[in-house]
Curated annotation (Swiss-Prot):
The keyword Zinc does not apply. InterPro entries: Leu-rich_rpt (IPR001611), LRR_dom_sf (IPR032675), Prenyl_trans_a (IPR002088), RabGGT_asu_insert-dom_sf (IPR036254), RabGGT_asu_insert-domain (IPR009087). It catalyses: geranylgeranyl diphosphate + L-cysteinyl-[protein] = S-geranylgeranyl-L-cysteinyl-[protein] + diphosphate. It comes from Pongo abelii (Sumatran orangutan). Belongs to the protein prenyltransferase subunit alpha family. PFTA repeats lie at residues 44-78, 88-122, 124-158, 159-193, 207-241, 363-397. This is Geranylgeranyl transferase type-2 subunit alpha. It comes from the Eukaryota.
Length: 567
């Protein structure tokens, strides 16, 4: 065996590696300790730069050491000549680039480079753009580098058209580039600003069609890549609902005025001020939410003094002015009437479709046809199925209702991991459709039974509803937003999976509550019902609490008018 190199055994190799790691750790710890000692002693000189270089060159994510380097550089700025300082900065930029090669996603390194360039009188921004291009060529999804490029482009005043062309080159090379798509969504509104009268952030139709063609090429090439689908969703866009007072309701019996808004607001804050005029005279009132919580809400109410409800006069006029939204609404309470209200007749587009898209129906219809073509080729593509559903909702939710439900069934089978989310989304859409049908019929009764609902939403739209049927669904709770239903008299919620009644509070007109065959376990869950003063009928048949100890004591705490049915 003479003349042949000895091959180390695996045990010897492991031991050598261990010794090497120990040696590196000792050097690392000693250098770190030396830096901290010098910093504490105020010795901020070039030796600290050398010591921190040894550590950061191997581990660029040591944030404290970057702070040390900045302190040293700030100190040296006052001591070095312009020529020496220029050489120091050049060396620092080179060191930073070497650190980025070790870890291209180092927060500390990119931040330090921003800081350094921000202190130079004449930075070479062209060089920085080239640096970004090199690193993005290696990893086009490096969002640290994208952030830095946006910083450089802003500082160098690079025209948006040039940056858009840069995203073109990267997307052409690889469609799966979320950062490039996102950057386009930032650049296009700058290149094509809309007039003040137009929806902000939206694109001219010719630009939109060109972008839709580009993104269609992307998801027809790789239908499973989500980045193009997200961009497609942005292109079709959504509009912020216009500020509006949806409904104004006055109750003589409760001596209360209730207002619902198009968006949640915090009344009493500096920006959200409500003014109440009664018979053209201002009335100072205290506004509160139906659930009593001081937080943003769609619905706000106030108590009214007896003088403003005097039944001797022919009528009383109530006008609420929302100063921030620059809108107002007025309703009349006639003599002999117990309530009065004013609710605008709104369309589906005004209520819900603005959440989905503001584009023309011709564009949406074209996109729907394209997505259906892709779905025939890729029948199990979840992104395509979801987009089809959303496009149908944006076009005509009632016309496409049955077809939308079929697509939901397919989507749940394709993507079982998100079944709960899809059930909630389906429930949201079904409830929206039911609200629209109720609006068109101009009734105050809403039937939502046997719809397989898993969640309740848009309850602020139901301020005037007197009868609500939620029977035979899959609801597990009744949300606090239910308190917005100030006119509700009958609530049917039997045959669900309800475990809590926390949302059934402060319903001033509730008379009947049917909760048969739910999952109410403990008598204590009935406590919120004590805040419903007119409750007469409470049906609890088929709930576990009917056999629970203490049920009679808990029922005794409810208003004496309540007739409880347990068996």
């Amino acid at each position: 065996m003479h003349g042949r190199l000895k091959v180390k055994t695996s045990e010897e190799q492991a031991e050598a590696k261990r010794l090497e790691r120990e040696q590196k750790l000792k050097l690392y710890q000693s250098a770190t300790q030396a830096v901290f000692q010098k910093r504490q002693a105020g010795e901020l000189d070039e030796s600290v730069l050398e010591l921190t270089s040894q550590i950061l060159g191997a581990n660029p994510d040591f944030a404290t050491l970057w702070n040390c380097r900045r302190e040293v550089l700030q100190q040296l700025e006052t001591q070095k000549s312009p020529e020496e300082l220029a050489a120091l900065v050049k060396a620092e930029l080179g060191f930073l680039e070497s650190c980025l090669r070790v870890n291209p996603k180092s927060y500390g390194t990119w931040h330090h480079r921003c800081w350094l360039l921000g202190r130079l009188p004449e930075p070479n921004w062209t060089r920085e753009l080239e640096l970004c291009a090199r690193f993005l060529e290696v990893d086009e999804r490096n969002f640290h580098c994208w952030d830095y490029r946006r910083f450089v482009a802003t500082q160098a005043a690079v025209p948006p058209a040039e940056e858009l062309a840069f995203t073109d080159s990267l997307i052409t090379r690889n469609f799966s580039n979320y950062s490039s798509w996102h950057y386009r969504s930032c650049l296009l509104p700058q290149l094509h600003p809309q007039p003040d009268s137009g929806p902000q952030g939206r694109l001219p139709e010719d630009v939109l069609l060109k972008e839709l063609e580009l993104v269609q090429n992307a998801f027809f090439t790789d239908p499973n890549d989500q980045s193009a689908w997200f961009y497609h969703r942005w292109l079709l866009g959504r509009a912020d609902p216009q500020d509006a007072l949806r409904c104004l309701h006055v109750s003589r019996e409760e001596a209360c005025l209730t207002v619902s808004f198009s968006r949640p607001l915090l009344v009493g804050s500096r920006t959200e001020i409500l003014l109440l005029m009664v018979d053209d005279s201002p009335l100072i009132v205290e506004w509160r939410t139906p659930d009593g919580r001081n937080r943003p809400s769609h619905v706000w109410l106030c108590d009214l003094p007896a003088a403003s409800l005097n039944d001797q006069l022919p009528q009383h006029t109530f006008r609420v002015i929302w100063t921030a939204g620059d809108v107002q609404k007025e309703c009349v309470l006639l003599k002999g009437r117990q309530e009065g209200w004013c609710r605008d007749s709104t369309t589906d587009e005004q209520l819900f479709r603005c959440e989905l898209s503001v584009e023309k129906s011709t564009v949406l219809q074209s996109e729907l046809e394209s997505c259906k073509e892709l779905q025939e080729l890729e029948p199990e593509n979840k992104w395509c199925l979801l987009t089809i559903i959303l496009l149908m909702r944006a076009l005509d939710p009632l016309l496409y209702e049955k077809e939308t439900l079929r697509y939901f069934q397919t989507l749940k089978a394709v993507d079982p991991m998100r079944a709960a989310y899809l059930d909630d989304l389906r429930s949201k859409f079904l409830l929206e459709n039911s609200v629209l049908k109720m609006e068109y019929a101009e009734v105050r009764v809403l039937h939502l039974a046997h719809k397989d609902l898993t969640v309740l939403c848009h309850l602020e739209q139901l301020l005037l509803v007197t009868h609500l049927d939620l029977s035979h669904n899959r609801l597990r709770t009744l949300p606090p937003a239910l308190a917005a239903l100030r006119c509700l008299e009958v609530l049917q919620a039997s045959d669900n999976a309800i475990e809590s009644l926390d949302g059934v509070t402060n319903l001033p007109r509730l008379q009947e509550l049917l909760l048969c065959n739910n999952r109410l376990q403990r008598p204590a869950v009935l406590q919120p019902l004590a805040s419903c003063p007119r409750l007469v009928l409470l049906n609890l048949q088929g709930n576990p609490l009917c056999q629970a100890v203490g049920i009679l004591e808990q029922l005794a705490e409810l208003p004496p008018s309540v007739n409880s049915i347990l068996t």
